[in-house]
Amino acid sequence: RGKTSEPHIVPLTTFHIKFMDEIKQTTGHDTYLFPSTGGATPRRYDTLTNAVRKFVKASCMDRFSPRDIRRTFKTVAGSMGISLELRNRLQGHAMTDVGSVHYDRYDYLAEKRTAVQAWIDGLSEIVKIKE
């Protein structure tokens, strides 16, 4: 769940699953994808923020925040032909139009799955990822 009370489901591709398996092999932990140092709990969100802040400072970048990743997804996925509605749904934005709020109960899972695969395929072309 995000900011809304609705579940936020983002389908995983085979690339994501393989990537998570590699992370688990690296950490040696099965319960949490990103375990804390002791492994008893998941790593805190601010750990990522702090690591990004240190990296930005050390690399002399002007600035960068994890939010820039969301902005990049929204922009690049649009250039790949993924509709604004699906990009919004994938980012967990609440649909506020009357039809969505009161009538549309469809989960858009199949469309999300297609969009996520298109995203991975597009990134693979950009950075030549091999699944």
Tell where the protein language model's regions lie, with residue ranges.
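Active-site/catalytic core of tyrosine-dependent DNA strand-transfer enzymes
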Residues: 11-62, 73, 94
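Active-site-proximal segment of tyrosine recombinases
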Residues: 64-65, 74, 81-93
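Surface-exposed helix-capping loop/turn segments at secondary-structure junctions
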Residues: 60-63, 125-131
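Catalytic-site neighborhood detector that most strongly recognizes the C-terminal catalytic loop/helix
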Residues: 1-3, 17, 40, 80, ...
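Short, mixed charged/polar active-site loops
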Residues: 4-9
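Active-site catalytic microenvironments for nucleophilic, acid-base chemistry
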Residues: 54, 58, 76, 80, ...
